[in-house]
Curated annotation (Swiss-Prot):
It comes from the Eukaryota. GO terms for biological process: protein exit from endoplasmic reticulum; protein ubiquitination; ubiquitin-dependent protein catabolic process. The keyword Metal-binding applies. PANTHER family: E3 UBIQUITIN-PROTEIN LIGASE RNF5-RELATED. GO terms for cellular component: endoplasmic reticulum; endoplasmic reticulum membrane; membrane. The chain crosses the membrane at residues 231-248. It holds the Pfam family zf-C3HC4. This is E3 ubiquitin-protein ligase RMA1. Keywords: Endoplasmic reticulum, Membrane, Metal-binding, Transferase, Transmembrane, Transmembrane helix, Ubl conjugation pathway, Zinc, Zinc-finger. GO terms for molecular function: ubiquitin protein ligase activity; ubiquitin-protein transferase activity; zinc ion binding.
Amino acid sequence: MALDQSFEDAALLGELYGEGAFCFKSKKPEPITVSVPSDDTDDSNFDCNICLDSVQEPVVTLCGHLFCWPCIHKWLDVQSFSTSDEYQRHRQCPVCKSKVSHSTLVPLYGRGRCTTQEEGKNSVPKRPVGPVYRLEMPNSPYASTDLRLSQRVHFNSPQEGYYPVSGVMSSNSLSYSAVLDPVMVMVGEMVATRLFGTRVMDRFAYPDTYNLAGTSGPRMRRRIMQADKSLGRIFFFFMCCVVLCLLLF
């Protein structure tokens, strides 16, 4: 019964709307067009704050405002100012009134339009390279002076046991006598003097140590005498061992 009712309904619709009421024609889907902005209109969000046009050779200030380089150059041109008030006004950002100069402009590359040859004939120089922050290098005269003073104070303190480095040696390297213990250096000199009869240590590696105020005191002399006695005993014991070895073997 339900099937017969559906056929009757279809026949009534065919009489009302004609034979083509249930004929579905195959149509191709219409292509969806998406508007993609071109390169010429891509700079619509990057407008100059002076000419309100797409930026040409864009530069940005430290306060974050974008300008064309020709526009901001004309704004900062000090030769066309007549009064000091006008000069001070044009030394400020046109938007936020913060200080602006040619040295604080940062160029932007890869955006905006470039100047053509006809536009380049105007008296507009090239864009600035941006602010340059110079760091004080260690080889500057002030830094080298501070380094020499700190080294002089460090090596001339007698209570720490340091000794001055010879002027021939570089300030970046440590001398041989500053690394070793001065007592060990003196012991080595005494051993060399007793064994070979001459002083082997170079004076440039251990310069004028005995002429210092810290080494000419009674405490240092007493230490030298004790080291000399100890070396004498060690040398005597060593010679006895050598003689015994020669006699036994």
